[in-house]
Amino acid sequence: MNVLSYFTWFVHLSSVLEWLNIIYFFLLYTKLKKNLSLKTFIFSFFISFCSALCACTLHFFNNQSFYYFLINLQSFLTLFANITLYFSILIYKQQILKNQNY
């Protein structure tokens, strides 16, 4: 765990806390607006949160070679999260346009 400086750990851990906060606030906002299409964003955010956990786990164990699979997992999760975020935006946009037509 001594490989990274305290400031780098601060950035990594604040990123994880940031994802938890955005997921929580999006859950509240979804309940407030009663719009189910917003829940697709939460799925994408959760995948990004898991990606951040991969980075923290790898660094926590001093980048040991046994945990190098986490690098590929983090890359895949980031890609998958970005793709799901794109489709979440499309779903939400479609929902907005549908509501405007009524």
From Swiss-Prot:
It comes from the Eukaryota. GO terms for cellular component: cyanelle membrane. Coiled coil: none annotated. The keyword Transmembrane helix applies. It is found in: Plastid, Cyanelle membrane. It is a multi-pass membrane protein. The chain crosses the membrane at residues 9-29, 41-61, 71-91. Keywords: Cyanelle, Membrane, Plastid, Transmembrane, Transmembrane helix. Pfam families: DUF2499. InterPro entries: Uncharacterised_Ycf49 (IPR019634). Belongs to the ycf49 family. PANTHER family: NUCLEOLAR-LIKE PROTEIN-RELATED, YCF49-LIKE PROTEIN. This is Uncharacterized protein ycf49. It comes from Cyanophora paradoxa. The lineage of its organism: Eukaryota, Glaucocystophyceae, Cyanophoraceae, Cyanophora. The gene is ycf49.
